[in-house]
Amino acid sequence: MAKHSHDHTHDHHDRPRRVRKPGEPLRIGVGGPVGSGKTALVAAICRQLRDELSLAVLTNDIYTTEDADFLRKHAVLPDSRIIAVQTGGCPHTAIRDDITANLDAIDDLIAAHDALDLILVESGGDNLTATFSSGLVDVQIFVIDVAGGDKVPRKGGPGVTFSDLLVVNKTDLAPLVGADLKVMARDAEAVRDGRPTVLQSLTEDPAATKVLDWVRSQLAAAG
């Protein structure tokens, strides 16, 4: 494996913050609890962008390659553009505390595919505390779903509060679980200090239109 670059500054937590150089792919992290719909969202983004951009996906699982296998099975990208990292422990460690394996995998993707525009980095399923290191991704999406009830945004947590985009997924299930989407939207707005929130159902909108619009805006801003 290629060794990652150590070009970075430091944020206020003294964690390495990557400095994205011109021509480097934008890295977007996709995190959230188990079963919230992270992999399905990654698949939707890939299907919509694969004909206009050069992109790749890096998944994280504890002991398996299940998420990467799902993406390959559904042919959202050529197999060589999907890499799995087996974290072998707490999934948030590999995306926040010791990101070496992820950085090396990203280097491998960049070496194998010229002029990548976007790399999606999917975390292993974890609770509401998991966030990405600023040395690993440029921006991050945090995915929750309505199955946990409308109290989830109110509970907060770093992912809900500080992610660049919060996605409340599976809104079509709200009537079945008694979740009030207006309450979820209101509570998310209250804790997110102006950061955007999207409520969506991939069943009703397989293209993930609002999330895709946000991804496009990040790509445009990144130049």
From Swiss-Prot:
Disulfide bonds: none annotated. One of its GO terms (molecular function) is nickel cation binding. Gene3D superfamilies: P-loop containing nucleotide triphosphate hydrolases. SUPFAM superfamilies: P-loop containing nucleoside triphosphate hydrolases (SSF52540). Residues 1-30 are annotated as: Disordered. GO terms for biological process: urea catabolic process. The keyword NAD does not apply. InterPro entries: CobW/HypB/UreG_nucleotide-bd, P-loop_NTPase, UreG. Keywords: Chaperone, Cytoplasm, GTP-binding, Nickel insertion, Nucleotide-binding. GO terms for cellular component: cytoplasm. Its main location: cytoplasm. GTP binds at G32, P33, V34, G35, S36, G37, K38, T39. The keyword Chaperone applies. It is found in: Cytoplasm. Facilitates the functional incorporation of the urease nickel metallocenter. This process requires GTP hydrolysis, probably effectuated by UreG. HAMAP family: UreG. NCBIfam families: ureG. Belongs to the SIMIBI class G3E GTPase family. UreG subfamily. Homodimer. UreD, UreF and UreG form a complex that acts as a GTP-hydrolysis-dependent molecular chaperone, activating the urease apoprotein by helping to assemble the nickel containing metallocenter of UreC. The UreE protein probably delivers the nickel. This is Urease accessory protein UreG. It comes from Mycobacterium ulcerans (strain Agy99).
